[in-house]
Amino acid sequence: MDRYHNRSAEILAFAVGLAMVGYVVTKAFSDHLGVDITAGGRLLLALFLALGMIGYAVWNEITDGFIGLRALLPLALSTLWSGMWPAMQYWGTKSLYFPGLPIEDQDLEWWANGYTQWGGWALILFGGYGIAYYTWRAR
């Protein structure tokens, strides 16, 4: 086989296959949680990002890296919290919800509205970094 062979078709087939596997995993995750695929996909992406940040922070703690667990844990948890917002809106609808209707116009429970979402995000992020700063100063 020629070394400089054009492999664009193989790369395209791999990308399409990877997208199909990602769709199937996201659909199964969404069905397991009982939400639509966009809410489940956002939650799954946030979960992967949070686990990646926590894994990177633990790896830096073990290898004496620059960014440790104390620095990345509030960011990882706030990322996970913000990924839950569409699922919380889906679970918190008071009236009947039919797929295709805009969920922003529905009546929501108190824990699914924007004030609780943004307030929880700010509490997790700024409270976490406040605790990290306080424990850093106490050393």
At which residue positions do the language-model features occur?
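Hydrophobic alpha-helical membrane-insertion segments
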Residues: L69-W91
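Hydrophobic core of alpha-helical transmembrane segments in multi-pass integral membrane proteins
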Residues: F14-V25, A50-Y56, W121-Y133
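Cytosolic juxtamembrane helix and N-cap/initiation of the first transmembrane helix
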Residues: M1-A19
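Transmembrane alpha-helix entry/boundary detector in multi-pass membrane proteins
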Residues: R7-L12, V25-L49, G114-Q117
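Canonical alpha-helical transmembrane segments
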Residues: A46-A71
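Alpha-helical membrane-associated segments of multi-pass integral membrane proteins
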Residues: Y97-R139
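Membrane-interfacial loop-to-transmembrane alpha-helix junctions, especially the N-terminal start
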Residues: R7-A13, F66-P74
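Juxtamembrane "helix-exit" motif on the non-cytosolic side of transmembrane helices
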Residues: Y23-V35, A57-I62, M88-G92
